[in-house]
Amino acid sequence: MTKQRVCPVCGSTEFIYDPERGEIVCARCGYVIEENIVDMGPEWRAFDASQREKRSRTGAPESILLHDKGLSTDIGIDRSLTGLMREKMYRLRKWQSRLRVSDAAERNLAFALSELDRITAQLKLPKHVEEEAARLYREAVRKGLIRGRSIESVIAACVYAACRLLKVPRTLDEISDIARVEKKEIGRSYRFIARNLNLTPKKLFVKPTDYVNKFADELGLSEKVRRRAIEILEEAYKRGLTSGKSPAGLVAAALYIASLLEGEKRTQREVAEVARVTEVTVRNRYKELVEKLGIKVPVT
């Protein structure tokens, strides 16, 4: 528990900080509580964000999402320059951008990270997922795992792995829709990277329940149906019925059953389309869950 500062003269707890003198004084009696305080902030003043940006002499923090981690210098743009000077600055910026990616490895990394930015933006993935995917990709490059594989398939595989590691529900189908490579190729790269980066099944395990809200939102199902679907999935997990099964297929079947039980029926086709699985998969998982868990589904 922190002690509250009290003026030793009058007992007041109200103080004024004087940045010019570097002092803290009592607001009631004027007693100097502390002096010679070092101001760790900048020596300049700014009244808005643009002034702050112009006057700041330090760059942005390091970022794993930039190929050079943001440590290179950028030449800015000044629209008030005359024609000749503007032309000169344009040429300098052009050369500077070329120097930033001086060799093939740098160019490949820059391309991979721009592709990562595109995929994560379209999937509306949070920043920490993008950063984890970038970390995995850099590690794969360091270990020489990219050779013989397309950059697009490896970066898509890293996005999928990052989603699974951080328990963000995204299916391989969703990622392959955005990526410029086929699902099979992404799957191969994903398995190869997972094996060589020691991403064990335990680390990559995603509970089917993590997908419930995502699919239920798209189907417009109530909280009551979601809770029932989660109960079904948890019971299935306890009985070992989820092992080796696609989470999307299991969730689709559980939501289908729950929608029937709670009187909010959705067709197998509707559920299959949302989960990006076939109707046959939904039907097979449905039969298995109903039989093994002894669920009595109302006849419709």
From Swiss-Prot:
Keywords: Metal-binding, Repeat, Transcription, Transcription regulation, Zinc, Zinc-finger
Disulfide bonds: none
Record bears the keyword Repeat: yes
UniProt repeat feature Sequence, residue ranges: 114-197, 210-291
Alphabetical list of Gene3D superfamilies matching this protein: 1.10.472.170, Cyclin-like (1.10.472.10)
Any one biological process term the GO annotation gives: transcription preinitiation complex assembly
InterPro entries: Cyclin-like_dom, Cyclin-like_sf, TFIIB, TFIIB_arc, TFIIB_CS, TFIIB_cyclin, Znf_TFIIB
GO cellular component, one term: transcription preinitiation complex
Binding site for Zn(2+): 7, 10, 26, 29
GO molecular function terms listed in the Swiss-Prot or TrEMBL record: DNA-binding transcription factor activity; TBP-class protein binding; zinc ion binding
Zinc finger (TFIIB-type): 3-34
Family: Belongs to the TFIIB family.
Its job: Stabilizes TBP binding to an archaeal box-A promoter. Also responsible for recruiting RNA polymerase II to the pre-initiation complex (DNA-TBP-TFIIB).
Identification of the protein by name: Transcription initiation factor IIB
Organism whose genome encodes this protein: Pyrococcus abyssi (strain GE5 / Orsay)
